[in-house]
């Protein structure tokens, strides 16, 4: 059905008379009491119908004459229909001409009103390509002191330009803009983090905000206005990515561990083999051992121990780091059992020298302990059973050449390997000699400290070496050294001799010069 027949067939008689441009009939209806702003089913008033009608016959009048008559009879130009359009919008959309638009503006039509599609009369005037009407609208805006910026963008499928009105914004290029029907939402905005300020690559020209759906044909232009919110800047040519990445991105835990190991190797380059040997010996002799003092007469040995502790702490290097260096220098090899017949020279020298030093300290403490004459003079004579036990113990302590040779062979045949840090050997201080007590050494005393006539080389007996213990030592597992009790078993049944002023001045001088 034709639009004219549709309009004329609906609504009241006043709307039908205005649609047919019958001025005389319209006058009669208004004088007869018809309401001039009465609307039809779509919300259109007689003034809107007068602006959009195209009906022409021999009895019709011009649009301007009909609009002028309706405005003179108090028609409201700012009433909106159900789609939000006013009479001014209909006049611009249907190309009613600059004369009709001027009449509406003079009657108080509002240029700032928008329909439900957010289009104003200016947008419809530009989309209809009516230059004269647009000039009238712009002149009206300037007369009211308003500056309007309108940007014509792409064309509709029918060939008409789509227009978006921007207020208080600088214009942008036509090719890079969007259709007015679709506005950018916050979800369509890409927030990009800025690159490092020290970077001088072309990627620093990107802004912090970009739009996802605005990549049109104009995205390859060289010029871009930074004030436009809808134009995505042209991307710089792809090149090598920046090396200034955050350290937590390119540094996994494995890489951090490798860097730490590399720095440890650099710190350990200046250490000589002699220093490394001394560190391992100190770590073996001084790691977590308990020291018990029974006399307070040793002056030199205390200073020696203090110097040893200071030397171990001044290097700021733990036994674990030494093991880490040796582990890395071997190429991360796995733990291998070392049989008795294999003798690596370096590790054997370390282990043998450590045991020799322990034996020397044991002998030194035994000799010094036997030099105390006050103990031998003040002791009660032992009973017959105790005397027999003491004689037996002295026999055990007296070394024989065969036992000494066997102990030397055992020291040479013990396989090398990194000892555990947790060998809880107990250092017992008796006199000025500090030596570890061991279950493997059958050396026992009575509770009241008898004098000992001990040879300088006590035997080391009951030491059995097998491949299993060697493998445990070579793998660095926890092997606890067996220890004898500090006090003998007979201590509970006997009283300890309390010493009072057991040293003379000459003996103290001898001990200091020892």
UniProtKB/Swiss-Prot annotation:
Keywords: ANK repeat, Cytoplasm, Nucleus, Phosphoprotein, Repeat. InterPro entries: AN34A/B/C, Ankyrin_rpt, Ankyrin_rpt-contain_sf. ANK repeats lie at residues 9-38, 42-79, 83-113, 117-146. It comes from the Eukaryota. It holds the Pfam family Ank_2. The modification Phosphothreonine is found at residue 272. The modification Phosphoserine is found at residues 263, 296. SUPFAM superfamilies: Ankyrin repeat (SSF48403). GO terms for cellular component: nucleus; pi-body. PANTHER family: ANK_REP_REGION DOMAIN-CONTAINING PROTEIN (PTHR24156), ANKYRIN REPEAT DOMAIN-CONTAINING PROTEIN 34B (PTHR24156:SF1). Belongs to the ANKRD34 family. This is Ankyrin repeat domain-containing protein 34B.
């Amino acid at each position: 059905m034709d639009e004219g027949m549709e309009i004329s067939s609906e609504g009241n008689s006043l709307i039908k008379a205005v649609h047919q441009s019958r001025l005389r009939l319209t006058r009669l209806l208004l004088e007869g009491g018809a309401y001039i702003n009465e609307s039809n089913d779509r919300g259109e008033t007689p003034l809107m119908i007068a602006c959009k009608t195209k009906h022409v016959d021999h009895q019709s009048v011009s649009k301007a004459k009909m609009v002028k008559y309706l405005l003179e009879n108090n028609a409201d130009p700012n009433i909106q229909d159900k789609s939000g359009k006013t009479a001014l919008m209909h006049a611009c959309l249907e190309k009613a001409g600059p004369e009709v638009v001027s009449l509406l503006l003079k009657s108080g039509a509002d240029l700032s009103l928008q329909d439900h599609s957010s289009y104003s009369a200016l947008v419809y005037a530009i989309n209809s390509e009516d230059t004269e009407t647009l000039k009238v609208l712009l002149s009206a805006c300037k007369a009211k002191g308003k500056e309007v910026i309108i940007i014509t963008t792409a064309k509709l499928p029918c060939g008409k330009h789509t227009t978006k009105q921007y207020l208080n914004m600088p214009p942008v290029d036509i090719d890079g803009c969007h259709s007015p029907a679709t506005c950018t939402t916050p979800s369509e905005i890409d927030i990009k983090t800025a690159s490092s300020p020290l970077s001088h690559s072309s990627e620093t020209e990107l802004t912090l905000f970009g739009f996802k759906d605005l990549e049109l044909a104009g995205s390859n232009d060289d010029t871009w206005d930074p004030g436009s919110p809808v134009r995505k800047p042209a991307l710089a040519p792809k090149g090598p990515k920046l090396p200034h990445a955050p350290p937590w991105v390119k540094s996994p835990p494995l890489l951090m561990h490798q860097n730490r190991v590399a720095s440890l190797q650099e710190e350990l380059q200046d250490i000589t083999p002699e220093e490394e040997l001394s560190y391992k010996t100190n770590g073996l002799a001084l790691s977590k051992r308990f020291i018990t003092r029974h006399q307070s007469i040793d002056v030199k040995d205390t200073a020696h121990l203090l110097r040893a502790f200071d030397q171990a702490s001044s290097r700021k290097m733990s036994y674990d780091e030494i093991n880490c260096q040796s582990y890395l220098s071997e190429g991360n090899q796995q733990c291998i059992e070392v049989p008795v017949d294999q003798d690596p020279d370096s590790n054997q020298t370390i282990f043998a020298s450590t045991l020799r030093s322990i034996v020397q300290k044991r002998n030194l403490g035994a000799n010094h302990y036997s030099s105390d004459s006050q103990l031998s003079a003040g002791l009660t004579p032992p009973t017959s059973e105790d005397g027999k036990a003491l004689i037996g113990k002295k026999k055990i302590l007296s070394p024989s050449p065969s036992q000494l040779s066997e102990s030397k062979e055992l020291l040479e045949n013990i396989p090398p390997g990194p000892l555990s840090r947790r060998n809880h050997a107990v250092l017992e201080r008796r006199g000025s000699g500090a030596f570890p007590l061991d279950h493997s050494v059958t050396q026992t005393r009575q509770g009241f400290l008898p004098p000992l006539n001990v040879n300088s080389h006590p035997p080391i007996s009951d030491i059995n070496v097998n491949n299993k213990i060697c493998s445990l030592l070579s793998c660095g597992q926890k092997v606890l050294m067996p220890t004898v009790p500090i006090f003998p078993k007979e201590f509970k049944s006997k009283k300890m001799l309390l010493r009072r002023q057991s040293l003379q001045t000459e003996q103290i001088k001898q001990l200091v010069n020892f």
